[in-house]
Amino acid sequence: MFYPDPFDVIIIGGGHAGTEAAMAAARMGQQTLLLTHNIDTLGQMSCNPAIGGIGKGHLVKEVDALGGLMAKAIDQAGIQFRILNASKGPAVRATRAQADRVRYRQAVRTALENQPNLMIFQQAVEDLIVENDRVVGAVTQMGLKFRAKAVVLTVGTFLDGKIHIGLDNYSGGRAGDPPSIPLSRRLRELPLRVGRLKTGTPPRIDARTIDFSVLAQQHGDNPMPVFSFMGNASLHPQQVPCYITHTNEKTHDVIRSNLDRSPMYAGVIEGVGPRYCPSIEDKVMRFADRNQHQIFLEPEGLTSNEIYPNGISTSLPFDVQMQIVRSMQGMENAKIVRPGYAIEYDFFDPRDLKPTLESKFIQGLFFAGQINGTTGYEEAAAQGLLAGLNAARLSADKEGWAPARSQAYLGVLVDDLCTLGTKEPYRMFTSRAEYRLMLREDNADLRLTEIGRELGLVDDERWARFNEKLENIERERQRLKSTWVTPSAEAAAEVNAHLTAPLSREASGEDLLRRPEMTYEKLTTLTPFAPALTDEQAAEQVEIQVKYEGYIARQQDEIEKQLRNENTLLPATLDYRQISGLSNEVIAKLNDHKPASIGQASRISGVTPAAISILLVWLKKQGMLRRSA
C-alpha cells in the first residue's frame, strides 16, 4: 500500500549524512521524510567518540555556517575540546571535541523531533520506485510505499555489509544492526558503478580494568573552544581527560605471529581500507621500523565505563585482541566489552554524480556519505547537508547549488569525489585545498552564511547574529585604521614597550597589528587603542584579516584566474573522439569522467595543459565556448 500523504524529499538512513540531509530539506520548507531502521540510533557514533580534527573541523564549521546540526550537537555533548595546530597559522588550526556518545545522540534526536516539516518513520527500506529513469519513492520491508519528488541515500556501511572478526564473518550493517541486502541488490540493478570498501573499529575496554595511575593524561584547552558560531562554552558538559599509552615490541610480536588469522592478510576481505586510519596490523607491517605506536584512551561518555582505544582498530580474532590490549602499559588486566571488527560494504562511484550529489543517470536520486566512498562523520555530514538542500531545491523546481573549491572544503570534497572518484575511503585534510588560507575554520560563516540565507537554510536568529558580527568587524577595523600614535606622543613609550623595534614614524592601530610581535589582545590594552571588542569571534577576525591581508589578496587573485576555467562549461553530451589532437588516453579519460567544466577536466589525472588548450580552441571554433554566471 501507499502511505496516504506524499512527500517532497525522502531521506534513507539516519546517520550523520542522513540527519543533516533531513534537517536541511525540512529547514527549506519541503515536506521531508526520514526513514531509518531504528529511531533509537539516529545520530549514532558508530566508531570513534569524537568530532573534528584537521580538515574535518573545517567541514563541521562549514556545516554550521549553513545552519547545520553537527556543531550544535557536539557543543552540547563534548567532554573535551582542543584546538589542534594551535601554534601554527590560522589556515591549519582545527577544533576537535571528544564526545559523550549518549548526549550526542540525544542532541541529534531532539533537534530532529522538533524540526518543522520533518517526519521520522521506523522501517528499513528494501526498494526504490523508479519510473522512466526518475526516482519517485521508496518501499519499506513491510511493503509500505512512500512517494516523493527526490530521494537521498545515506545508508553508511549497511549495503551488503559484512563484519569480520578473525576468519569468521557474518552479515551486518555495523555491530548489533542488520545489513541492507535487498536495497543493495536493487541498487546494483541500476546503471551505476559499484565497488567494495572496508573500514574497522577497535575493541572497547572496561575503564574499571585500566590502571590510569601509570598513564599520561591529556587535558582539553582552557578556555574551552566552541564549535558552533551560535554556541558558547557554557553549553559544554563536564570536561574530562584522555589518557595515553603505547604499543611495544611485545604487542608487535603478537600481531606479526597471528597475521595468518587476519582476514585482511589472509585475503578474505576484498574491500580497500582507509589509508589514513589504518588497522594496528597495517601499522605494524607498514612501519616495521617503529617499536611503538601512541594509543589514546578516550572515554565514551560521562556515565559510561567504556573506553575507546584510538589507534588499535583491528579485525584479528578475539583471543589475539585480548593479547594486544593486555600487552600495553596500564592495560595488563584490561577487559574487552566489545570486540573490534572490520566491515566491508558497497559504495557507488561518485564520478556518476553531479556536483549537487544527484545521480547523472537516475533523476532525483541523491547519494551522500560512505556510499560515495568517504570515511568520517564530518565528511558524511557535509555531503548530507549538500544532498539534502539540493533534493529540496529539485523538489521545488529550482536549480541545484554546489560550492566551488575556492569557497569551501565541502567544495573541495565534492569536486575531488565527482571529478577523480576514489579507490579507498576518502578523508578530508587541509592539504587537499589549494586555497586553504581563504578556507579557514574561523571564517566559515563569512564564506557561507549569506549563501545559506539565500538558500533558505539559515534562520533569523543566526542571520541577525551574523550581521552583528560583520558590523563589529567593520567598525573595529575602521577604528584601528583611524587611531594613530606618533613617536613623540605621550603614548609612544607604552606602545614601544611591546615592540621589538621602537616607532620611527606615525602608525595606525592596523599598522601595529601587522607586526608579528603584536596581537589584538595586547594592542587593545594600550591606551590609544583600548577597549577591545567583547565579541571574541569578531576580534579574532580583525586580527587575522589585518595580519594576513597581503597573503589573502594574492590568493584571491589566484582564485579569480582559476574561476575562468571553472566557469567554462563543457557539454554533457560531448564525445571527445571528435576533437583532433587529443591523445587516446585523454579522450578515454574525458569520455569516462564527463567533466562539467574546463576546471574539472584539468584536475583529471593524465589530462595535460596542452590537452586543455586544444579543448579551449576547439570549443571556440565550434562556437561552444560559454561560461556560467
UniProtKB/Swiss-Prot annotation:
InterPro entries: FAD/NAD-bd_sf (IPR036188), GIDA_C_N (IPR049312), MnmG (IPR004416), MnmG-rel (IPR002218), MnmG-rel_CS (IPR020595), MnmG_C (IPR026904), MnmG_C_subdom (IPR047001), MnmG_C_subdom_sf (IPR044920)
Originating species: Shigella flexneri
Primary localisation category: cytoplasm
Gene Ontology CC entries for this record: cytosol
Pfam families per UniProt: GIDA, GIDA_C_1st, SAM_GIDA_C
Family named by the database record: Belongs to the MnmG family.
Lineage, highest ranks first: Bacteria, Pseudomonadati, Pseudomonadota, Gammaproteobacteria, Enterobacterales
One Gene Ontology MF term: flavin adenine dinucleotide binding
Gene: mnmG
Name by which UniProt lists this protein: tRNA uridine 5-carboxymethylaminomethyl modification enzyme MnmG
Assembly mode: Homodimer. Heterotetramer of two MnmE and two MnmG subunits.
